[in-house]
Amino acid sequence: MKLIIFTGLVLLLIVSLIDVEAQNEGACLPRGSVCTTNHASCCFKLSCDCYRRFEKGVEKGQKCWCIPTGLRYSKEKE
């Protein structure tokens, strides 16, 4: 009887751990997602890269995106 209860508790623990791990994996932001308000929420191997936006010389705020770590975008020369 004790073995059945112990086995049931172990199975319940394993299922709970698998569920928690699955929830944690889904909590991060994928590549290309906006991360302006939460810089630390990008998925593994992604970083939150920000730039300032200007329209006609007037600053319009900051935008941040989840991009691969080490990748840099630059403005194309016209």
Swiss-Prot record:
On modification after translation, the UniProt record reads: Contains 4 disulfide bonds.
Keywords, A to Z?
Disulfide bond, Secreted, Signal, Toxin
- Pfam families per record: Toxin_35 (PF10530)
- What start and end residues bound the annotated signal peptide? 1-22
Query: Principal localization?
Result: secreted
Choose one Gene Ontology CC annotation of this protein and give it: extracellular region
Chain residues in the propeptide: 23-26
The places in or outside the cell where this protein is found are: Secreted
The entry lists its GO molecular-function terms as: toxin activity
Provide the free-text tissue specificity comment from this protein's UniProt record. Answer: Expressed by the venom gland.
Which family does this protein fall into? Belongs to the neurotoxin 19 (CSTX) family. 07 (U7-Lctx) subfamily.
Official protein name in the record? U7-lycotoxin-Ls1g
**Biological source species:** Lycosa singoriensis (Wolf spider)
